[in-house]
Amino acid sequence: MTAPALDLVALLRELVRRPTVSGDAGAQRDVLGTLTEVLRERAPHLQVTEGRDRDHPWTLLRTPADPGRRQLLLACHVDTVPATDPAAWQRDPFDGDLDGGRVWGRGGSDMKAGVVAAAAALAAADPGTPVALLLTSDEEIGSQGAAAAAAAVAELPVGAVVVPEATGNQVVLGHKGALWLAVRTAGRAAHGSTPERGHNAVLDLAALLARAGGVLPFRTDPFLGTETWNPGVVAGGTVPNVVPDRAEVVVDMRTVADGGDLLAWWRAQPEVADVEVRVDLPPVGTPADDPWVASLPAPVLPTPATYFTDASVLVQVVRGAPIVVWGPGTPAVMHAVDEYVELAEVEQAAAAFTDVVSRWNGPPAGSRREP
């Protein structure tokens, strides 16, 4: 008996109802298992590879097509950012309410809608079509699940990649990379009533940050734009009446090339005692004239995505295959209170991905790529 087609709405609501906050490996692993079960019920021929990293789980599902043919890879993450201050939400962020043609809740746009659309395309794929679905964890904290899966992806002859993040179903050709640094200053503790006997690490950090914005060696790319920085987290000191002997800022920089020059700048500053690299992901950019991109049934935006995606990991292992960010959802509500996704966009994405999969010819590895 043939299994029913994947119910987009029911699956999306179930996923939203199950919190999968980055760093919660158990919750993410459970959802990976649910998705695998749902897909295997509808496509029992799918081959499944599960990652062994306990902290950053991942799953790769693919058709049993000729392994020597180039794979179309759909790459999704199942984690979300936290739903901070639930009282500020008009609805419970994990109820998955269906109202007004929208599914409401954390992860609706980022990116459980994309997961569902990609899963529908894989479930409908002919077993002979070389297509794979990569499901990762912990994308929101530096694409750690994708990094754990990178070696497995590197073994595939990937011909093209779709990352179904929220773009309003428009094709995006890339985004900046990310360099997150923990920059630390060191001082000398003393009683707060005699600050002259100590050295204040917080004041050093404040002076450093005040200077950095005007002198950081930012570069500009014609497509990606100019590099940016955001000192996102600052910490220092212990109690008011002690001169702080340490302080730290975590800086988020979005890069258009290798981040070595920026890292070197921070390390060279006189106030800096130590720099720790937390995230280092390269930028992504696919040529607009790529023949496969031209074949996609969606408009191509002339601007990059403002966020980074797992594409920053995949670009390092797919040997020049074109990568697009393309999926359902509204970028403006990603990480926001009252996140939602339009059901019409989810249905449109599922249909478009299914069409792209059905037309994928999977040329032999080593041959010239074709759309």
Go through each PLM region and give its residues.
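Metal-dependent amide/peptide-bond hydrolase catalytic core
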Residues: 2-3, 10, 20, 49-52, ...
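Active-site phosphate/pyrophosphate- and oxyanion-stabilizing loops and adjacent acidic/basic residues
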Residues: 37, 147-151, 294, 312-313
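Generic recognition of long tandem-repeat/solenoid scaffolds
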Residues: 59-63, 98-105, 272-275
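Short glycine-aspartate micro-motif
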Residues: 71-73, 103, 157-163, 180-182, ...
